[in-house]
Amino acid sequence: MATSARRAYGFGRADEATHPDSIRATLAEFLSTFVFVFAAEGSILSLDKLYWEHAAHAGTNTPGGLILVALAHAFALFAAVSAAINVSGGHVNPAVTFGALVGGRVTAIRAIYYWIAQLLGAILACLLLRLTTNGMRPVGFRLASGVGAVNGLVLEIILTFGLVYVVYSTLIDPKRGSLGIIAPLAIGLIVGANILVGGPFSGASMNPARAFGPALVGWRWHDHWIYWVGPFIGSALAALIYEYMVIPTEPPTHHAHGVHQPLAPEDY
């Protein structure tokens, strides 16, 4: 999978939104985000149903439940990124797309279309989960008891920073060469590991679409802003640090009137 060799900031060409490659990439983001959120949120609903029927407490609040949820997220994201990587780059996360935008690896038009696709994919996944589970409300994310807003925000910043840094080092860095299956595997593993760290405190979302779908369908908005602000700050920090401190310094490419040639679907 090729990557853009140089940073190129700009809004994008007017015809980029209707270009066949852009449409295919947007569809890939929609489908992969759907697959990821359906499996990830579904694993939580499945555990809750099992524990509601056989115990007095929710399964996700137990050590075993935490491990199972982390594994489900890791496996699902590994599969989702692998499925989309050669078409869209396999973002499957608005925060990853934002980091690529901040780093000059995608145009603003491409980022907007990815965000819309990712959010719609997450919403559809949660709607189908509610339908197929006979009305169970998606759980989504909220801060645990005793965890303040600042604590949760900083935790989401750190967790997302780690995720996007791994994405940059395995997928975006133009010096990396082809890593094949290692890239989506590494991304899935860091998400699983981060859930083991942050799950008991903030839920470890790291993904605004992953948080938005359950919040909308389950109508659970408590602390929701944290799961947008934290991941976006963390992704921007990771992108800027990797672009300007890890990747050799290069002058940004500017084009007339803020417009540049659209990047290929996998160039981010």
Swiss-Prot record:
<feature type="short sequence motif" description="NPA 2">
    <location>
        <begin position="207"/>
        <end position="209"/>
    </location>
</feature>
<dbReference type="InterPro" id="IPR000425">
    <property type="entry name" value="MIP"/>
</dbReference>
<feature type="transmembrane region" description="Helical; Name=2">
    <location>
        <begin position="65"/>
        <end position="85"/>
    </location>
</feature>
<feature type="topological domain" description="Cytoplasmic">
    <location>
        <begin position="247"/>
        <end position="268"/>
    </location>
</feature>
<dbReference type="InterPro" id="IPR022357">
    <property type="entry name" value="MIP_CS"/>
</dbReference>
<keyword id="KW-0472">Membrane</keyword>
<dbReference type="GO" id="GO:0015267">
    <property type="term" value="F:channel activity"/>
</dbReference>
<feature type="transmembrane region" description="Helical; Name=3">
    <location>
        <begin position="109"/>
        <end position="129"/>
    </location>
</feature>
<keyword id="KW-1133">Transmembrane helix</keyword>
<feature type="transmembrane region" description="Helical; Name=5">
    <location>
        <begin position="179"/>
        <end position="199"/>
    </location>
</feature>
<keyword id="KW-0812">Transmembrane</keyword>
<feature type="modified residue" description="N-acetylmethionine">
    <location>
        <position position="1"/>
    </location>
</feature>
<keyword id="KW-0007">Acetylation</keyword>
<feature type="topological domain" description="Vacuolar">
    <location>
        <begin position="48"/>
        <end position="64"/>
    </location>
</feature>
<dbReference type="InterPro" id="IPR023271">
    <property type="entry name" value="Aquaporin-like"/>
</dbReference>
<dbReference type="GO" id="GO:0009705">
    <property type="term" value="C:plant-type vacuole membrane"/>
</dbReference>
<keyword id="KW-0677">Repeat</keyword>
<keyword id="KW-0813">Transport</keyword>
<feature type="topological domain" description="Vacuolar">
    <location>
        <begin position="130"/>
        <end position="146"/>
    </location>
</feature>
<feature type="transmembrane region" description="Helical; Name=1">
    <location>
        <begin position="27"/>
        <end position="47"/>
    </location>
</feature>
<dbReference type="GO" id="GO:0006914">
    <property type="term" value="P:autophagy"/>
</dbReference>
<comment type="similarity">
    <text>Belongs to the MIP/aquaporin (TC 1.A.8) family. TIP (TC 1.A.8.10) subfamily.</text>
</comment>
<dbReference type="GO" id="GO:0000326">
    <property type="term" value="C:protein storage vacuole"/>
</dbReference>
<feature type="topological domain" description="Cytoplasmic">
    <location>
        <begin position="86"/>
        <end position="108"/>
    </location>
</feature>
<feature type="modified residue" description="N-acetylalanine; in Aquaporin TIP3-1, N-terminally processed">
    <location>
        <position position="2"/>
    </location>
</feature>
<feature type="short sequence motif" description="NPA 1">
    <location>
        <begin position="93"/>
        <end position="95"/>
    </location>
</feature>
<dbReference type="InterPro" id="IPR034294">
    <property type="entry name" value="Aquaporin_transptr"/>
</dbReference>
<feature type="topological domain" description="Cytoplasmic">
    <location>
        <begin position="168"/>
        <end position="178"/>
    </location>
</feature>
<feature type="topological domain" description="Vacuolar">
    <location>
        <begin position="200"/>
        <end position="225"/>
    </location>
</feature>
<feature type="transmembrane region" description="Helical; Name=6">
    <location>
        <begin position="226"/>
        <end position="246"/>
    </location>
</feature>
<feature type="transmembrane region" description="Helical; Name=4">
    <location>
        <begin position="147"/>
        <end position="167"/>
    </location>
</feature>
<comment type="function">
    <text>Water channel required to facilitate the transport of water from the vacuolar compartment to the cytoplasm.</text>
</comment>
<protein>
    <recommendedName>
        <fullName>Aquaporin TIP3-1</fullName>
    </recommendedName>
</protein>
<dbReference type="Pfam" id="PF00230">
    <property type="entry name" value="MIP"/>
</dbReference>
<dbReference type="GO" id="GO:0042807">
    <property type="term" value="C:central vacuole"/>
</dbReference>
<feature type="topological domain" description="Cytoplasmic">
    <location>
        <begin position="2"/>
        <end position="26"/>
    </location>
</feature>
<keyword id="KW-0926">Vacuole</keyword>
